């Protein structure tokens, strides 16, 4: 059995208060799901990338499963996921196979590397996540506009969104890329990106951080 990661984004026209309350209310139900190894209920940032301002119309759900079968059972049969689908106006779903993951999220690395090879033309998903040191918050947020501009100008990025557990302190992003080569070009050749990465290490911004790279498979959920 290979681990399966699913990341879903739900956008709301109505039911926004319900969506906000699910950040806490969904946790007991998720804890009881057979085969679940890790999960996070996540808010999102306004606009694209990191943002000081929340997007109260969009929320995300990250789940990690011991197998594709347990993930499928949850997505097909869970009353919780059906309520998300019914109450939201639109959704984006990403089925993720881990290619690489290093660092920690809540004192653990939840993503196990898949043994399957990357297929030609597969899209790439990137999750970056960090808990910021309180003393470094102002420095970090001063650099956010430059970081957002760098990814906006990156060749091959198809979509990206800021996500997080707590505003200001626990921040993450998910980005979808056309190819692994274009991810590497951005990581190693972008002067803006390289400067920011260097500064994070030099200034010790993060109490905890994680970087994970995934192969992305199409995932379409239907609801009544």
PLM regions: where:
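A common structural junction motif
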Residues: 79-85, 194-195
């Amino acid at each position: 059995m290979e681990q399966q990661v699913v990341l879903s984004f739900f956008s709301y026209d109505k039911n926004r208060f319900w969506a906000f309350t699910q950040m806490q209310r969904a946790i007991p139900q998720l804890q009881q799901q057979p085969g679940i190894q890790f999960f996070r209920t996540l808010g999102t940032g306004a606009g694209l990338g990191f943002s000081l301002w929340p997007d109260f119309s969009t929320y995300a759900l990250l789940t990690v499963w011991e197998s594709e079968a347990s993930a499928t059972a949850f997505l097909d049969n869970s009353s919780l996921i059906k309520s998300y689908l019914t109450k939201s106006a639109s959704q984006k779903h990403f089925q993720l196979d881990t290619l690489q993951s290093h660092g920690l999220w809540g004192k653990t690395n939840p993503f196990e590397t898949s043994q399957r090879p990357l297929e030609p033309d597969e899209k790439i998903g990137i999750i970056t996540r960090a808990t910021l040191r309180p003393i470094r918050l102002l420095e970090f947020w001063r650099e956010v506009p430059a970081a957002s501009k760098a990814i906006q100008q990156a060749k091959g990025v198809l979509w990206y969104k800021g996500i997080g557990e707590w505003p200001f302190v626990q921040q993450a992003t998910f980005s979808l890329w056309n190819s692994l080569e274009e991810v590497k070009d951005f990581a190693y050749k972008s002067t803006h990106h390289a400067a920011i990465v260097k500064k994070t290490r030099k200034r010790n911004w993060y109490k905890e951080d994680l970087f994970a790279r995934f192969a992305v498979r199409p995932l379409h959920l239907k609801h009544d």
